[in-house]
Design a protein with these regions (language model features):
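C-terminal outer-membrane beta-barrel translocator/porin domains of Gram-negative envelope proteins
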Residues: 6-9, 13-102, 106-110, 114-116, ...
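Short glycine-rich, acidic/polar surface loops and turns
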Residues: 89-91, 128-136
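Conserved active-site loop/cleft motifs that coordinate metal ions or position small ligands
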Residues: 105-107, 143-149
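Outer-membrane beta-barrel transmembrane domain signature
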Residues: 110-130
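Short beta-alpha connecting loops at secondary-structure transitions
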Residues: 128, 147-149, 159-163
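Outer-membrane beta-barrel "beta-signal"
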Residues: 135-142, 160-171
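A short, acidic, flexible beta-alpha connecting loop/helix-capping segment that sits on the rim
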Residues: 150-154
Length: 171
């Protein structure tokens, strides 16, 4: 939890809670369960500025374009004051017999974004979810990730992203 003053006189409390557990069910198979909750609130009671609102990152909700789900005002996604995500991932290692650097990944993601303080009619608090399969490839230039995801629950205004390619890793 932190209080931050960012480029103005508005002081915002930004609270985070992250939980992650790893489990090896058999040799080289690692399954991960992750839960994240984040909230932002103005200590002065003012509405949180658009630039300070929270969005769901694409790596936490595959199958949707990063920052393109949740409350909208006209054609603009406006984020929210609260975000929660749940991710379940399992790795199927060495599926290709002679290739040691490629793993197949199965995943299920769910997330929610809510809390529009200036207009509650814009607040769409439906849970979005997706399932998919990915390929993790450790190359000499670094890890490459290819993922294909299919949204299960969504809102009509959400923007889908079935395929995603990433270079590098997140911590």
């Amino acid at each position: 939890m932190s209080d931050r003053l960012v480029g103005s006189e508005m002081c915002i409390r930004d609270s985070n809670y992250d939980y992650k557990i790893f489990k090896e069910f058999y040799e080289n198979n690692v399954s991960t369960f992750a839960f994240s909750l984040r909230g932002a609130s103005s200590l002065s009671g003012d509405d949180i500025k658009l630039s300070e609102r929270l969005y769901i990152p694409g790596r936490k909700l595959r199958g949707f374009e990063s920052g393109k789900i949740g409350p909208k005002d006209g054609s603009d996604f406006i984020g929210g004051n609260y975000v929660s995500t749940i991710n379940a991932t399992t790795t199927i290692p060495k599926i290709l017999e002679n290739v040691q650097t490629v793993d197949i990944v199965l995943f299920a993601d769910a997330a929610n974004i809510w809390g529009v303080d200036y207009d509650s009619s814009l607040d769409k608090s439906g849970i979005r979810s997706s399932v998919g399969v990915g390929l993790d490839w450790l190359t000499p230039v670094g890890p490459l990730t290819f993922s294909f995801a299919q949204p299960i629950t969504k809102e009509p205004t959400d923007i889908e992203e079935t395929f995603r390619f990433n270079i590098g890793t997140s911590f």
